[in-house]
From Swiss-Prot:
Enzyme nomenclature, EC number: 2.5.1.18, 4.5.1.1
Pfam families, per the entry: GST_C, GST_N
Function: Conjugation of reduced glutathione to a wide number of exogenous and endogenous hydrophobic electrophiles. Has DDT dehydrochlorinase activity.
Keyword RNA-binding: no
Residues that hold glutathione according to the record: S10, H51, T52, V53, E65, S66, R67
Keyword annotations from UniProtKB, A to Z: Lyase, Transferase
Organism whose genome encodes this protein: Drosophila erecta (Fruit fly)
GO MF, one example: glutathione peroxidase activity
Entry protein name: Glutathione S-transferase 1-1
Gene (UniProt): GstD1
GST N-terminal domain residues: 1-81
PROSITE patterns: GST_CTER, GST_NTER
An annotated GO BP: glutathione metabolic process
SUPFAM superfamilies linked: GST C-terminal domain-like (SSF47616), Thioredoxin-like (SSF52833)
Record-linked InterPro entries: Glutathione-S-Trfase_C-like, Glutathione-S-Trfase_C_sf, Glutathione_S-Trfase_N, GST_C, Thioredoxin-like_sf
Length: 209
């Protein structure tokens, strides 16, 4: 069984948990207390020099960065390739969505909310505009689409649903974006591990209360 170093409230950690559920892999979950500095202990830094979560250790093979872990789990354990198809064009669209999630959507969350939550900084209206722009892009991607990349659930949907659900608990109005809202409501029903994802979101919500 693979060791999984994580934090329940973390969106990237939740995307890995849902992906593992989708491919039927059980994770040996190891909770890290980042506020206590667990990630800086020498034994963890030896596993992951970047000392970040999530980190997976599968039979001695260590990997971090959630989207890399998602792809690894599907390629190694998926009974089919439906979550990350081998077709170059399908895979390219999934990769684009994953990079969009990492560099634009989730990044906009971090840039706007993290300074407020962790540094008690005032809200930055310019950073909020970046969130709105990211949701407009996602709304466009989802025009006429039930899924984020193609016609079935993929790792792109799983990564995006982890991010979008985090925006929901932060109080962002997802309903303003009709295509995103429709996709999100469906994703809640069809994404394996949604319940655990939502429990993690509620854990994270405490920072906003």
């Amino acid at each position: 069984m693979a060791d999984f170093y994580y934090l329940p409230g973390s969106s990237p950690c939740r995307s890995v948990i849902m992906t593992a559920k989708a491919v039927g892999v059980e994770l040996n979950k190891k909770l890290l207390n980042l506020q206590a500095g667990d990630q800086l202990k020498p034994e963890f830094v030896k596993i992951n020099p970047q000392h970040t979560v999530p980190t997976l250790v599968d039979n001695g093979f260590a990997l971090w960065e959630s989207r890399a872990i998602q792809v690894y789990l599907v390629e190694k354990y998926g009974k089919t390739d439906s979550l990350y198809p081998k077709c170059p064009k399908k895979r390219a669209v999934i990769n684009q969505r994953l990079y969009f999630d990492m560099g634009t959507l989730y990044q906009s969350f971090a840039n706007y909310y993290y300074p407020q939550v962790f540094a008690k900084a005032p809200a930055d209206p310019e950073a909020f505009k970046k969130i709105e722009a990211a949701f407009e892009f996602l709304n466009t991607f989802l025009e006429g689409q039930e899924y984020a990349a193609g016609d079935s659930l993929t790792v792109a949907d799983i990564a995006l649903v982890a991010s979008v659900s985090t925006f929901e608990v932060a109080g962002f109005e997802i309903s303003k974006y009709a295509n995103v809202n429709r996709w999100y409501e469906n994703a809640k029903k069809v994404t394996p591990g949604w319940e655990e994802n939502w429990a993690g979101c509620l854990e994270f919500k405490k920072y906003f209360e």
